[in-house]
Amino acid sequence: MLIFAAPSRTVSVLCRYLSFGPSNMHHRLLSVLAASAVVGVNAATTASPYDYIVVGSGPGGGPLAAELDRAGFSTLLIEAGGDEGDNPTFADIGNFNEAANDEATRWDFWVKHSDDPARDLKFTHNTWDTGDGTFYYPRAAVLGGCGMHNAGVCALPADDDWDIIAKKTGDKSWSADNMRKYLKKIEKNEYLPAGNAAHGYDGWLSTSVANNSWAKNDSLPDTKILQKLAELTGQDPDNAANLVNRDLLESGKKADDTSSFYNMVTHADAKGKRSSPNNYIRATLADPVKYPLTVKLHTLVTRVLFDNTTTLSKPSVAPRAIGVEIMEGASLYRADPKYAPGAKCPISQILANREVIISGGAFNSPQILKLSGIGPAAELTKFSIPVVKDLLGVGENLGDNYEGSILARGSAPVESRLITLLLRTPSAPTRKLNIYAWCGAFSFEGFWPGFPTYYGPTQYSCAMVHMAPKSQAGSVRLASADPQDWPEINFRFFARHGEQDLREIVEAADILREAINAAGPPVAPLEERHPCPGGKAAANCTDAAQAEFFKLQAYSHHAMSTCAIGGDGDRMAVLDSRFRVRGAAEDIIAEAKKLPR
């Protein structure tokens, strides 16, 4: 999926790619950019070769650093991981499961889903718990970030989601009408004829789609499932072969509130080669005379530095970020599976003439902010961190999409063909689509080292994502003042309006189950493994039983909103509409892991 943020006074273009589906397409930018600092450096006496320092090379920070450098600003891009751009595991988009499990790029977080340990222990794949949480949550530490190991799905938010930000902040540049141009700026469309006004053809990000000609064959089990889904979601079954080619990146209100099939768009070229920020960064580095971008790999940022004239001794002076403190070396962060306990490297400092930009993602951006003295004062004081700016919202408001699946085994194998569907369930409180689903010969039950489980050649699944969760009660809080330590992460799933969200998920499951069972021979009959072993007629397939299953077995990987953008009257807002940390000096920018929902 792609999300583009309005350019700040720097020239930023922000995008976010999803791993397995546009589940957060209505809610978030995965990279949070935020600037902060600690006291101790006098900028007036120290020169720097860099105008900008960008921390994090993922879909937010990587393209931003390249854009800044191409605009004529000397830019330093800092990445904690290495460069796997020449590794075929990451080059081919179809290798996403292998890529996500590769220790060369993984950061392994362990998170909680609730404040009830007994509840969390009921997750089927909790055997990998390390004691810090029950649920495995993979992240990427590599040049290009998550764009290097995800499944590459590209999607856009609903128009209403852009307009909500514009209304919250009073900044009309966030309006849906204005945001489309950023897709066109970075896209290199490879699946539509040139000249389509909704797309771009000269950007750095290749987009492509699959060949869905199989849908014209009415005898295929996949086609029978497709046609049943059409019937159940108010579409024309006789036109299903054409509907599956609908553009997932199309524009218009109808795309926001009409259940429909789509052809999944991926950030890959027509040959299946991954297109990511890694490519754009490398293309910029390839011309060092024209674009003198500097990249530091295997470098952990421990905090952001303040000019020593902007301390708490002068509360009327807004804190001004002037650089970062770093530790150089591979695998220095505890989440790295190659981390060696006790590993330490020398600390050094790098200064910026203009701005510091943090793009560490939903977990690490708030951690860096807090380690730098920006966050809830009570939490910082607990770890003896000097408070530079008391901002209650840093690390709060954490949310994510709820994900789940129906998994069955057929009487015969089904070819690997993918059905992509966006739908609105009957009890959804608004007209907006609330479920993204994709069906095919795969299994997807969540995340654990080595995922997914292979159930044999007859496996068939419909995975789904709740795109409009109503609870954002989670948090990212410091476990210690050690920058090599991971934070404490608790999503508090279903804490608010959980019954309604679960009702919508169960309704989607019932639709998908009925469609799967329309596959016909030789695939039918199918044996459902979950959520209803034995199928809909089984005694364990009540609405309540299904809701309990999804409550306990839900998983996610689109964390958001821990440094949320908000209006002047929002006490939990961390950033303004130009990605600047609230209460910091004009030259402190944050470019966004933080759509407010």
What are these regions (language model features)?
Residues 21, 26-95, 137, 143, ...:
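Structural core of flavin- and non-heme-iron oxidoreductases
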